[in-house]
Amino acid sequence: MERNQIAAQLYTIREYLKTPSDIAASLKRVRDIGYQAVQISGMGPIGPAELKKMTDDLGLEICNTHIDYKRMEEDLAGVIEEHEIYGCRYIGIGGLPGEYRNADGYHRFAVAASKIAAALAAEGFIFIYHNHSFELERYGDRTGLQILYEDSDPTVFMAEIDVHWIQRGGADPAAWIRS
């Protein structure tokens, strides 16, 4: 994917991605609009090879994904295999699991996710974390998002800054991007 290329985040049309035929029709519409890349998330059941064929047939690149963190914990080899099929190096999670949403939890997640991110990096993949506004809640002198970024391994734990959620949380998106 080109550095400044815009991709369609498929989670925004998840209501139209329930079945393989829905997915095929929606991907065609996304391509017809002019997108050349998509982020996979919020889709109904479809095998990775079938999805890859659909995107290839339309000339769409799968540039990144959002998957359930529990899947990374329980089946990292399967996650890697799926992303090999996609030809996609960026593997993200769409949100922090609820059990980590406190000061200690943010730290524990940063440490645990860094280990998973390191394992992904060893296989040539990049772990990305997608924020929401709740990570801007303060815990002492730091926000949850600061805890995540400061307590994780910055060589393998990468940010996917969602400017909407940063703004909604009352912070400056440009400042977060620069940091």
Regions found by a protein language model. Name each.
Residues 7, 63, 92, 128, ...:
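Structural detector of well-ordered beta-strand residues that form the stable sheet scaffold
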